[in-house]
């Protein structure tokens, strides 16, 4: 307004004087400058007229000129601005009158007087009665309310058909427009409404994800685009589905729209996961920092995007979680051939890192594993709730830990080292540490949360020790803590359950158990052809053909056989001892406190200890030179068993352990049927005494208390014929071999019982004198020029105890003499060799390495001079005896290992010597060995960011780290931990040690300089110029010159001249290798061929090759390969045999004659390592020699010239490679020759065992140590006996053979855990099935039950042998147990077998509910155990038989459940109960699957289906993949099977109504959330309520019909009763929940009419 005062006066009063001062013009001006109200006017008829619309100027217009808008009022008025043009002008003229201008616009009253209305009358009526007043007012108010409600429901309510929602259409855009559209989408400032009118065509699946990531589109907009794309795709699918329906008159019932939606969502999830997988694999290719930053940014976006999709349910959660776990499995070598090779390497004897080399071409992509673990942590809460996912996760985590731990590492600060390793799978040490740490923490949490998810029988044989290591190596918990005790208890239970369920090892190569050498060959073949599908028989043939050039005929069948043993199996313990795989698991089984609740193994530790003692002294095991195996075992018992005990009653446990050892030794003297080596027994006793495991006084007290020597030998003239004579002689021999001086009790017994007495003191003094003259004096005077065994013959013939005493005296005397020496002492290889030979002669290499070598290398008095040659010899000796060095026990378990100290000293001495001496030795192999032997990383378990655990790490658990690699059966490793307790004067820390080792590994090859070459040529008086060695072009000529000169003077060289000559040759070899690798060997081949053609003496030729191996010009395998390729054409067969077997086995006399002392020692080490690491090649070489003999292979040169060494090799090879041994012999020898040869191997030279009539004699000598040979012998005998027999005759003969064996068997240990279970493992599958059938029939039909209600009758069960002397239950228990875990084929179940099982079950059930006391409990335990094992063996075929024979009532299943709840199993037999429980779960799964897949099976039709157990389950495909063992029951969904009517499936849940044996989780209280928590982890609230989808799909939102009858009965509203209406839950899919991008009110994805929504449109008053 132009004049405010005029407007105010105009509006405030109608007084004429208010405008007296105003002119007409002013008033007119005021009319036109008045602001128009912002509130529009709403006509009454606009909502009901669909033809009317609102113009852009917010003015209501009509499509028809005759229409008039009516506005609500008591007296409807008309807005002239909305009238047609003609009428509007008329109305305007009416308003332009003087009255309106003077007084303002006003309406006249409708009546002349208000009193003329009915108001007064109505008011009087209302208030005339107080009782009626309230009711009427209330009713009037209700009418007024209803009028408003009616207006909102009828007039203002949003109509359903007003919703015009639709997803943006997909249009084809040019590249530039598409890019612009995506750029606008990524711009948060650009309104979504501007671009939401269309979508670019072609954006879907992986392209969609890639565009979102690359454009970095905000998450909210990314979700909008994703929903639009997904919804569009679904609509297309639905249209296709609808279009096909009319064409199919009989559609499949389960092919519904819901099925399409499920498949569609899974396909989208698969695309997303696949993109994530490929993206994760690219992580390893990022090497530039800029690309790394881009990659991390994209990864961060992807994680946020996937998290949003998961929360908003825009993917299939079950499918997604299952798929991300596949990242962990992808790339792992888990094929059948892989697992066989892995198991072979776990049994490997070699110290070299064989498994690391095997992993050379396996790409364990760390990117996919890191991202998978990240996603697992993100969705951890959901995964933890699903047992089947937790089970798969636990298995995959353990497998990943198993492999990642073994792959090599490299230092990120060094590029050369990584290149040197040449491993595609190599990880940086930091990354490997973090990966293992994350996996370890996750496994720890999973195990403590729910131990049942670790029932993973398929790969248990691989990962069981990994699980033990992770859980038991936590530095935060002491060994005897409550938590660790409970963990060990649960581990035993988990181990039992997994080992019991390991049936039909489908993931293991079926033909056999691949030995380690075959595995190495397969690994080599893999590098060439990348093929992993070779069986052992084929590999054997290939090896044989490649080495011998001959063809092996296919005469031996490939039987499905696999050795799978439980960890506590006696044969498994022996196998560990044979391979010296001495880990914590074995140590735990030897600790007296390790007691199980099972009646079977109450004293198992005693049995296990007896096995260890017997293994050390049995005649069937050769303990290598110097009794090294015995020394290793004794040090293992000291360090890993006794020093590892930390419980309160440690002294009593050690005393019990000592008493048990003495009891075993004492009983040995009284056993006449045990074949032992007496000398080994004496060494064992002396070493145990030296380690203070046993004491002599305890043995003497036990001996005296026995009363054996109570009677004087002269008291009875027939004493020599007394039955105790053998025992007395054994004990007297032990006393004479004890390391005691001046022991009155021992001397008294020996004087009394030996004719000439035994003077310890005299022999000891004489031995001291000899050692002083021959060793100490010559060493101190630097005149040690040679060593002669003859001079120490007296020492060699002394008793073992005196040898040990002399070793200790010499060691102390040498240390004292050298320390006090006034002059320098030179230590050369000859001295090292002489000292080594003496200590080996006295069976005391422990002291040699632990004390003497350490003393020499430390050189604390600085009086010892040691050069490179001596240091290299020491290094090679340590490598040769590393397993002994590894286990040498210190003063306590916390002390640093001898191996690590020696490695440190070698490096320190090398660094010192390298400044003043040339290195022409192959020290690179030494550094590589140390690198493999020493852990490169810090511990990956039980870490803490603070320093609170430092002390624990420094003390007890430090040695758990030192021995960390033992538990996984990889090369034995030590841990150079920086927290190792250091001496005050020891500043050489583990970090410095690691850095020095890295530098040495990267050091370049050194060549001789010109000065050295000139000096060498001058000293050797070679007629050649320096240029021949300095110029590469002349290097080939220099090799020929040196070799010709060397061979000419071989045998006449002094040691100095020979060393110089070899230095020149090695220098030329290095020069050639630096240019063209392999050319040196080509030159040598030509030289050897030319040399052989000159017809030199074979002895001189052998000496040359020995020298070349000693100086490592040739490695043994390189030399033998060269000789096999060139010499057969040049030498006769006899000459070739003499050459190769002298190089392989050697003659000590020839070695000492042609080699220097130290060279002979080096050659022995080289031979030992070659034969051990290439035993297959040696075996095939011997087979070649055997096959060349026309009559019998006993005439072969090898057996004649090297009989004892060849037989020793075959004994060892038959133990480690039994199947290969058997197949190889069968290919080159007749059965009669093989039988004679096998008899020789078990020391039977007279009356050999060769037919079924000899089996009683064989049964009496079979034991666990000669089992491999006896297995092969029994196989050949049975093959000969059953040849040309039909099935019935074969079974009868087998029954006869089995009766003879069972009637004559003897057991040194226990019958329930013996050799018998594997005695028939190498028979054909047909014969094994027949034997199984015989034993099953015997057990099910002949077992006698005595069950009575009479309290005076003892309830019992037994199964006697045919001669009535032996109860066979424990023997058959061992057989069925080992058959069940080693069988590969499915065993069929006949009706007769099922009938026998059903009858037997009723008897067992009766027994299990009776009172059983005393020894009968053991028989009952064995009976039920055997029965369950038979069920496990028949499990796969038993399912169909149960359905066929018992499908109507399932009596068999019900009886099994009754057995589960029986009195015997419910009390003190937890293991049996758990085994039956797991078996029932497997049977339930199998029966359920069979019934679902066979809906027409003959089952009760009136049983209903309980589908409650089907909730929270993935599809069957994912179930079978994630849960291959089938222990997760009831997780199948009918729509994923071809079942037309799911209701026909019986109600198995009611039948299998069983509860877990133990539903408590005792370890849950120890879970530490901090170990698995991370910033990305979604909380339960986010997973359950975090997304918009959860807010809308809340259970409180329901659909009800709208109330539209508000005015239908106006005056009855107060009395209206509520009617019950049906409720329906409101639900909307996540992809349907789209953001409203339009401007219209009701064009969103949710129709507002569903909420009875209305608009409020009120005109201004």
From Swiss-Prot:
Query: Does the record bear Transcription regulation in its keywords?
Result: yes
Kindly give the InterPro entries that the UniProt entry links to this protein: Mediator_Med12
Which domain of life does the protein's organism represent?
Eukaryota
Subunit architecture: Component of the SRB8-11 complex, which itself associates with the Mediator complex.
Give the keywords, sorted: Activator, Nucleus, Repressor, Transcription, Transcription regulation
Gene Ontology CC: one annotated term: mediator complex
Please give one Gene Ontology molecular function term for this protein.
transcription coregulator activity
**Disordered: region residues:** 1-22, 524-550, 1501-1527
Report biased composition (Polar residues) as residue ranges: 7-22, 539-548, 1505-1527
Subcellular localization: Nucleus
TM regions (residue ranges): none
Pfam family of the protein (one):
Med12
Q: What does this protein do?
A: Component of the SRB8-11 complex. The SRB8-11 complex is a regulatory module of the Mediator complex which is itself involved in regulation of basal and activated RNA polymerase II-dependent transcription. The SRB8-11 complex may be involved in the transcriptional repression of a subset of genes regulated by Mediator. It may inhibit the association of the Mediator complex with RNA polymerase II to form the holoenzyme complex.
Return the similarity comment: Belongs to the Mediator complex subunit 12 family.
Q: Where is the signal peptide?
A: none
- Protein's UniProt name: Mediator of RNA polymerase II transcription subunit 12
């Amino acid at each position: 307004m132009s004049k405010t005062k005029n407007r105010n006066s105009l509006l405030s009063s109608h007084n004429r004087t208010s405008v007296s001062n105003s002119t007409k013009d002013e008033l007119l001006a005021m009319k036109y400058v008045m602001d128009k109200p912002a509130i529009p006017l709403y006509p009454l008829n606009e909502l009901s007229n669909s033809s009317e619309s609102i113009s852009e100027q917010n003015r209501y217009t009509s499509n028809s000129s005759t229409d008039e808008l009516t506005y609500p009022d008591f007296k409807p008025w008309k807005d002239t601005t909305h009238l047609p043009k003609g009428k509007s002008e008329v109305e305007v003229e009416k308003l332009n009158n003087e009255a309106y201008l003077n007084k303002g616009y006003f309406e006249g009253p409708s009546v002349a007087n208000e009193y003329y209305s009915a108001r007064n009358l109505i008011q009087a009526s209302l208030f005339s009665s107080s009782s009626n007043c309230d009711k009427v007012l209330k009713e009037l108010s209700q009418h007024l309310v209803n009028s408003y409600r009616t207006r909102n429901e009828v007039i203002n309510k949003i109509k359903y058909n007003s919703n015009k929602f639709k997803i943006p259409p997909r249009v084809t855009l040019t590249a530039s427009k598409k890019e612009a559209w995506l750029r606008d989408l990524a711009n948060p400032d650009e309104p979504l409404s501007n671009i939401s009118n269309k979508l670019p065509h072609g954006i879907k699946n992986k392209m969609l994800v890639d565009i979102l990531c690359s454009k970095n589109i905000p998450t909210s907009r990314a979700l909008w685009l994703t929903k639009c794309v997904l919804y569009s795709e679904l609509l297309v699918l639905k249209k296709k589905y609808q279009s096909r329906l009319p064409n199919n008159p009989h559609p499949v019932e389960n092919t519904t729209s819901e099925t399409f939606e499920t498949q569609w969502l899974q396909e989208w999830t698969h695309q997303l996961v696949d993109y994530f997988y490929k993206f994760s694999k690219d992580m390893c290719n990022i090497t530039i920092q800029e690309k790394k930053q881009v990659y991390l940014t994209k990864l961060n976006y992807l994680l946020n995007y996937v998290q949003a999709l998961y929360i908003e349910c825009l993917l299939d959660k079950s499918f997604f979680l299952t798929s991300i776990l596949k990242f962990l499995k992808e790339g792992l070598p888990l094929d059948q051939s892989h697992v066989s090779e892995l198991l072979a390497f776990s049994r490997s004897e070699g110290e070299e890192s064989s498994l690391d080399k095997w992993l050379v071409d396996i790409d364990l992509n760390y990117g996919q594993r890191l991202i998978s673990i990240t996603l697992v942590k993100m969705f951890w809460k959901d995964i933890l709730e699903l047992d089947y996912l937790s089970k798969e996760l636990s298995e995959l985590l353990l497998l990943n830990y198993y492999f990642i731990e073994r792959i090599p590492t490299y230092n990120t600060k060094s590029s050369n080292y990584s290149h040197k390793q040449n491993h595609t799978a190599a990880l940086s040490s930091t990354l490997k540490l973090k990966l293992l740490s994350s996996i370890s923490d996750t496994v720890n949490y999973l195990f403590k949360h729910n131990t049942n998810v670790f029932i993973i029988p398929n790969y248990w044989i691989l990962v069981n020790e990994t699980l033990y290591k992770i859980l038991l190596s936590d530095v935060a918990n002491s060994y005897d803590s409550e938590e660790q005790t409970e963990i060990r208890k649960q581990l035993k239970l988990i181990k039992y359950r997994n080992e019991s369920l390991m049936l039909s090892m489908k993931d293991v190569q079926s033909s056999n158990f691949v030995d380690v050498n075959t595995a190495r060959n397969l690994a080599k073949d893999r590098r060439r052809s990348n093929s992993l599908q070779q069986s052992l028989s084929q590999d054997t043939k290939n090896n044989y053909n490649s080495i011998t050039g001959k063809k092996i005929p296919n005469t031996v069948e490939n039987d499905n056989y696999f050795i799978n043993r439980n960890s506590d199996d006696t044969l498994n313990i022996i196998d560990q001892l044979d391979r010296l795989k001495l880990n914590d698991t074995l140590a735990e089984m030897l600790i007296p406190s390790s007691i199980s609740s099972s009646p079977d193994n109450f004293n198992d530790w005693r049995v296990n200890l007896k096995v260890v003692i017997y293994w050390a002294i049995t005649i069937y095991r050769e303990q290598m030179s110097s009794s090294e195996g015995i020394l290793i075992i004794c040090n293992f018992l000291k360090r890993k068993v006794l020093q590892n005990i930390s419980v309160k009653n440690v002294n009593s446990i050690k005393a019990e352990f000592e008493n048990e050892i003495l009891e075993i030794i004492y009983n040995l003297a009284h056993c006449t049927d045990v074949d032992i080596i007496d000398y080994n027994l004496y060494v064992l006793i002396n070493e145990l005494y030296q380690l203070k495991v046993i004491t002599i006084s305890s043995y003497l007290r036990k001996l005296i208390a026995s009363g054996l020597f109570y009677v004087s030998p002269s008291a009875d003239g027939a004493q020599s014929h007394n039955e105790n004579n053998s025992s007395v002689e054994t004990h007297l021999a032990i006393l004479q071999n004890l390391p005691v001086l001046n022991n009155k009790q021992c001397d008294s017994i020996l004087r009394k019982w030996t004719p000439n007495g035994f003077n310890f003191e005299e022999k000891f003094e004489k031995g001291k004198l000899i050692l002083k003259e021959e060793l100490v004096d010559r060493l101190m005077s630097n005149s040690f020029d040679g060593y002669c065994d003859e001079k120490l013959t007296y020492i060699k013939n002394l008793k073992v105890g005196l040898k040990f005493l002399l070793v200790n005296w010499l060691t102390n005397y040498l240390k004292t003499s050298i320390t006090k020496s006034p002059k320098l002492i030179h230590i050369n290889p000859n001295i090292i060799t002489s000292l080594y030979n003496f200590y080996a002669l006295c069976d005391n290499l422990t002291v040699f390495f632990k004390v003497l070598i350490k003393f020499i290398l430390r050189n604390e008095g600085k009086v010892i001079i040691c050069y490179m040659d001596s240091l290299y010899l020491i290094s090679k000796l340590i490598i040769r005896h590393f397993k002994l060095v590894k286990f040498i026990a210190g003063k306590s378990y916390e002390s640093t290992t001898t191996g690590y100290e020696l490695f440190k000293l070698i490096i320190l001495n090398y660094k010192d010597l390298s400044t003043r001496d040339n290195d022409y030795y192959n020290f690179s192999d030494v550094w590589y060995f140390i690198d493999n032997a020493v852990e490169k990383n810090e511990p990956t378990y039980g870490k803490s960011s603070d320093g609170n655990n430092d002390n624990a790490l420094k003390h007890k658990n430090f040695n758990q780290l030192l021995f960390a690699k033992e538990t996984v059966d990889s090369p034995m490793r030590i841990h150079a931990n920086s927290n190792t307790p250091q001496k005050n004067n020891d500043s050489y820390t583990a970090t410095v040690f690691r850095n020095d080792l890295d530098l040495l590994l990267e050091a370049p090859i050194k060549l001789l300089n010109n000065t050295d070459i000139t000096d060498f040529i001058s000293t050797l008086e070679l007629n050649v110029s320096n240029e021949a060695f300095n110029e590469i072009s002349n290097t080939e000529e220099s090799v020929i010159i040196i070799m010709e000169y060397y061979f000419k003077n071989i045998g006449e060289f002094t040691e100095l001249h020979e060393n110089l000559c070899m230095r020149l040759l090695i220098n030329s070899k290095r020069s050639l290798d630096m240019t063209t690798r392999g050319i040196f060997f080509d030159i040598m081949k030509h030289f050897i061929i030319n040399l052989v053609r000159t017809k030199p003496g074979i002895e001189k030729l052998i000496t040359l090759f020995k020298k070349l191996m000693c100086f490592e010009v040739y490695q043994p395998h390189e030399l033998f390969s060269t000789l096999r390729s060139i010499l057969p054409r040049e030498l006769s067969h006899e000459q070739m045999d003499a050459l190769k077997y002298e190089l392989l086995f050697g003659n000590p006399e020839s070695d000492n004659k042609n080699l220097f002392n130290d060279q002979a020692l080096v050659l022995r080490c080289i031979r030992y390592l070659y034969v051990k690491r290439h035993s297959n090649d040696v075996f095939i070489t011997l087979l070649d020699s055997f096959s060349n003999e026309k009559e019998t292979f006993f005439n072969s040169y090898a057996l004649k010239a090297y009989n004892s060494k060849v037989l020793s090799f075959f004994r060892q090879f038959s133990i480690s490679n039994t199947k290969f041994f058997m197949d190889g012999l069968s290919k080159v020898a007749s059965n009669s020759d093989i039988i004679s040869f096998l008899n020789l191997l078990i020391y039977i030279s007279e009356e050999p065992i060769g037919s079924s009539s000899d089996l009683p004699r064989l049964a009496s000598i079979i034991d666990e140590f000669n089992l491999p040979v006896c297995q092969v012998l029994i196989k050949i005998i049975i093959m000969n006996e059953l040849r040309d027999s039909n099935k019935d005759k074969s079974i009868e003969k087998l029954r006869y053979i089995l009766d003879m064996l069972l009637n004559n068997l003897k057991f040194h240990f226990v019958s329930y855990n013996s050799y018998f279970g594997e005695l028939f493992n190498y028979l054909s599958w047909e014969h094994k099935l027949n034997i199984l059938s015989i034993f099953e029939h015997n057990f099910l039909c002949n077992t006698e039950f005595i069950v009575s209600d009479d309290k005076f009758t003892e309830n019992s069960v037994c199964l006697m042998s045919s001669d009535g002397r032996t109860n066979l239950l424990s023997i058959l228990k061992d057989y069925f147990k080992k058959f069940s875990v080693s069988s590969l084929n499915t065993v069929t179940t006949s009706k007769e077998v099922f009938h026998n099982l059903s009858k037997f079950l009723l008897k067992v059930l009766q027994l299990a509910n009776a009172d059983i006391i005393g020894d009968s409990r053991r028989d009952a335990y064995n009976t039920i155990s055997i029965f369950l094992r038979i069920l496990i063996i028949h499990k796969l075929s038993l399912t169909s038989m149960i359905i066929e024979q018992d499908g109507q009532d399932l009596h068999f299943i019900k009886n099994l459940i009754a057995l589960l709840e029986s009195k015997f199993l419910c009390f003190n037999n937890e293991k049996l109960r758990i085994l039956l429980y797991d078996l029932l779960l497997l049977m339930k799964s199998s029966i359920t699957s069979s019934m679902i897949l066979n809906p027409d099976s003959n089952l009760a039709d009136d049983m209903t289906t309980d589908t409650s157990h089907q909730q929270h389950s993935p599809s069957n495909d994912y179930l079978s993949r994630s849960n291959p063992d089938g222990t997760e029951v009831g997780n199948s969904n009918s729509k994923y099977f071809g079942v037309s009517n799911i209701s026909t499936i019986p109600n198995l849940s009611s039948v299998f109504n069983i509860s877990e044996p133990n539903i408590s989780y005792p370890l849950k209280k120890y879970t530490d959330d901090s170990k698995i928590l991370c910033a990305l982890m979604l909380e339960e609230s986010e997973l359950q309520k975090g997304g918009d989808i959860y807010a809308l799909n809340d259970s409180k939102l329901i659909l009800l019909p709208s109330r539209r009858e508000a005015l239908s009965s106006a005056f009855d509203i107060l009395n209206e009763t509520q009617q019950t209406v049906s409720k329906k839950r409101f639900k909307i899919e996540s992809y349907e929940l789209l953001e409203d991008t339009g401007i219209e009110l009701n064009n969103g994805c949710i129709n507002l009419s569903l909420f009875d929504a209305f608009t409020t449109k009120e005109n201004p008053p």
